[in-house]
């Protein structure tokens, strides 16, 4: 019975039912400017007009910059513009000029202007099979970084091997000695994403990393750097440095815990939970199901998720998953999908036939273990989680409150000027039934004054919870993870001159 229950929880992967689609009208351009930043958006179907419209205020912002100022220029286009991304990147690079480090990419929708979310208007199936259903939209986020800042860009095409993970000096030559933050963009077919994440975490431990995966466009390239379209499957890293530059990262995984905290007592391989508190995982899940509310039980059947954290982290505070009883202590769970069941070998016995010399092996297979999309170690803590719109809203609210507290306790005085928002393509209308939920919540938490831009990603890259600058945080929380159904916010600001 418990094995059947576990199979049901795995099989019913959580995919929110899309709301009824409504006819789309072209929206008025949305723009927002604050100090040295500009964000704009356009839904014009003509990519040339869309780039001009979204960049309407860029020239005014850049006119206030000195020749040696570093300029970060990001352009996001929905799948409706996928066939023109090379031309869009080139036109955008011309709009922002030679001083800027420009990136243009394809997402499942865009965030921009006054914090508006413009999704592509298609279901998940249509995104994969019929790009003509996607309503074109485009947004830009352009900023002049604080004095003394610099931007180093590196790109790794499938046939261009990045430095080995253990070669610190090679990575420092590429990205600088001590970047404040790195923006990481990659295509779903990227060959070097894992190595890039591992190297950034290993060699720049105080550097915040945020980014996302683009949405595939029939196998074609989806990212440009400085107006040039590189081969499909590339990974891009932008390293931002500067004494007055302040960059924070917040990641909300949109989940709620269900049941008690347990211990992983045995693993098989590196990604299989073989025992939880000395029992098969199916037995533990059955116990959680019996103690859950009707709503939690329904969500567990749709798709149970697993939250993991090192045992030592249970005594550390800071962001994580929303607790239904309002408890905000140490909820730093890395939430991962259950990707299958694996028979767990408990005992193995070998012997040989003296006459024939044949070697025999007998194995006793116990109950199936849980295969999860993360490395698991014996001693890790584990807790089952569920995901729905309520959990997603509550978790984002919790993470932003955590961010405000950690920012205040860090003691550094700085402004908040812009925010790069990267939600999953499975959020937005598909999850909440309306557009703009994540962006409105983030914008309000940042005081409503930040320039906002971003894109709907096919995988979100960031920490666990909120990481404020180089402030102390558990290593596993600072580590760069690829999330699902998450929203990542990268907050840009300028430190007070006295903080230099």
Spans of features found by a protein language model:
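Small-residue-enriched flexible segments
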Residues: 34-72, 77-85, 91-450, 455-500
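Basic polycationic patches enriched in arginine
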Residues: 21-27, 127
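N-terminal compositionally biased, intrinsically disordered segments and leader/signal-like regions
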Residues: 3-4, 21, 32, 124
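N-terminal mitochondrial targeting presequences
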Residues: 13-14, 29-35
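N-terminal chloroplast transit peptides
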Residues: 2-20
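N-terminal functional modules and adjacent low-complexity/disordered segments of proteins
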Residues: 1-3, 9, 29, 101, ...
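Short, intrinsically disordered, low-complexity terminal segments
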Residues: 8-10, 25, 30, 327
């Amino acid at each position: 019975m418990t094995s059947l229950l576990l199979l049901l929880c795995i099989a019913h992967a959580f995919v929110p039912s899309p709301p009824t689609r409504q006819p789309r009208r072209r929206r008025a351009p949305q723009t927002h400017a604050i100090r040295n930043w500009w964000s704009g958006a356009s839904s014009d179907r003509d990519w040339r007009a869309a780039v001009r419209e979204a960049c309407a205020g860029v020239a005014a912002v850049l006119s206030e910059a000195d020749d040696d100022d570093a300029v970060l220029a990001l352009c996001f286009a929905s799948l409706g513009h996928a066939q023109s991304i090379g031309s869009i990147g080139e036109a955008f690079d011309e709009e922002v000029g030679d001083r800027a480090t420009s990136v243009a990419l394809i997402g499942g929708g865009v965030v921009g202007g006054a914090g508006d979310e413009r999704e592509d208007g298609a279901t998940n199936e249509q995104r994969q099979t019929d790009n003509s259903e996607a309503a074109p939209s485009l947004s830009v986020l352009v900023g002049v970084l604080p004095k003394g800042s610099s931007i180093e860009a590196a790109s790794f095409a499938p046939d261009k091997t990045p430095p080995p993970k253990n070669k610190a000096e090679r990575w420092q030559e590429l990205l600088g000695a001590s970047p404040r933050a790195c923006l990481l963009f990659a295509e779903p077919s990227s060959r070097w994403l894992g190595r890039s994440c591992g190297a950034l975490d290993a060699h720049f431990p105080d550097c915040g990393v945020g980014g996302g995966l683009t949405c595939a466009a029939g196998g074609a390239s989806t990212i440009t750097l400085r107006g040039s379209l590189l081969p499909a499957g590339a990974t891009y890293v932008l390293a931002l440095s500067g004494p007055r530059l302040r960059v924070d990262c917040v990641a909300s995984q949109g989940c709620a815990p269900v049941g008690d905290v347990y211990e992983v007592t045995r693993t098989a391989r590196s990604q299989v939970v073989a025992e939880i508190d000395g029992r098969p995982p199916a037995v533990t899940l059955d116990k959680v199901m019996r103690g859950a509310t009707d709503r939690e039980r329904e969500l567990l059947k749709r798709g149970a998720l697993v939250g993991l954290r090192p045992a030592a982290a249970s005594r550390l505070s800071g962001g994580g998953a929303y607790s239904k009883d309002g408890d905000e202590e140490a909820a730093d769970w890395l939430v991962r999908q259950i990707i299958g069941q694996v028979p767990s070998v408990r005992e193995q016995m070998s012997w040989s036939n003296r006459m024939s010399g044949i070697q025999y092996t007998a194995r006793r297979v116990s109950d199936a273990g849980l295969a999860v999309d993360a490395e698991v170690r014996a001693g890790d803590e584990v807790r089952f989680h569920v995901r729905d719109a309520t959990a997603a809203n509550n978790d984002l609210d919790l993470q932003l409150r955590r961010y405000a507290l950690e920012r205040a306790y860090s003691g550094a005085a700085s402004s908040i000027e812009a925010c790069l928002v990267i939600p999953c393509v499975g959020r937005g209308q598909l999850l909440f039934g309306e557009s703009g939920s994540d962006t409105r919540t983030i914008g309000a938490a940042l005081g409503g004054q930040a320039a906002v831009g971003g894109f709907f990603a096919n995988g979100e890259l960031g920490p666990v919870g909120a990481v404020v600058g180089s402030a102390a945080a558990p290593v596993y929380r600072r580590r760069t993870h690829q999330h699902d159904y998450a929203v990542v916010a990268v907050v840009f600001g300028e430190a007070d001159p006295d903080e230099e």
